[in-house]
Amino acid sequence: MGEEEKKPEAAEEKKMEEKKPEEKKEGEDKKVDAEKKGEDSDKKPQEGESNKDSKEDSAPAAPEAPAPPPPPQEVVLKVYMHCEGCARKVRRCLKGFEGVEDVMTDCKTGKVVVKGEKADPLKVLARVQRKTHRQVQLLSPIPPPPPPPEKKAEEDKPIVEEKKVEPPVVVTVVLKVHMHCEACATEIKKRIMRMKGVESAESDLKSSQVTVKGVFEPQKLVEYVYKRTGKHAAIMKIDPPPPPPPEEAAAAAEGEKKEEEKGEGESKGEEGKDDKAKTDEEKKEGDGGKGEGEAADNGGGEEEGKVVEVRKIENPYYYYYYQPPRVAIPPMEMPPHAYPPQLFSDENPNACTVM
């Protein structure tokens, strides 16, 4: 019995020993919290005292007066004004302009003073220059210099390959122009020399030809001559001849190649075609005789049956009469007036003599 009573007592002692270190830790934590609260409470009265001192120092200071507004910006321009009317015109064009509050002009010195905080000097300058049509200078404020150009933009631009420009070809053109006198030849030569690109022009009155030398298109020269002189011109000769365009030159080269290939193929196939050609000729001769006979039979009849009407006589009589005037009612045909009968005429020796 004694041992059983000792066992629960030993278990209780162990529990008490385990609780003691936990209680010690809790006590230490409480002490640390209390110390922190004490420090905070000490700081608060110090801050309050400092705030009170600052309020006491600021209280006796007098309130500061508000700063005066800055004067409005002045724009000074130089404009030529020879009378009060010019000055009035300048003031009127700037009155009510954006940002302008007041305008003062001085005709003697030629200065215009524009007051306004939001007035843009460059816009005011452009306004006066546009309205007065005079040269205007901006004396103040001096506009800032333009920013330097960005080098990056130049670097970013793609490099363009320079195309080789071929030198212009000097062309000599002979034109056929009708000229009936020396004045015509001189006038045509003078007009042609005014065309751009023409170096020289020579006119020949006997052959009615004009020789033109220079850098130009022959077709445009013909159009220019007709436009300036009213005379039709024809191109007789071009020296040197103009080169064909690239598309036509390529097509011509391809055509030459095809012709060469065809020539080689034809030379190979000529031997085989000789026999066929002979047989074809014999057949054609046989068919040709029949065709000629049929053509003779049919063609002869057609030629005989054709009647060519040279002139058709509308009026069967051999005399004429005046046409009636045009009226709304269709005209009536008048009976034709015949010649008097010659049967009983005294002038006709072959007339009847039995009277």
UniProtKB/Swiss-Prot annotation:
Record-listed Cysteine methyl ester modification sites: C352
Protein name per UniProt: Heavy metal-associated isoprenylated plant protein 7
Gene behind the chain: HIPP07
Bias-annotated ranges (Pro residues): 63-73
Biological function: Heavy-metal-binding protein. Binds zinc, copper and nickel in a reversible manner.
Domain HMA: 72-136, 170-234
Propeptide residue intervals: 353-355
Keyword entries, A-Z: Lipoprotein, Metal-binding, Methylation, Prenylation, Repeat
SUPFAM superfamilies: HMA, heavy metal-associated domain (SSF55008)
Binding-site list for a metal cation 2: C181, C184
Region annotation (Disordered) ranges: 1-74, 132-157, 235-308
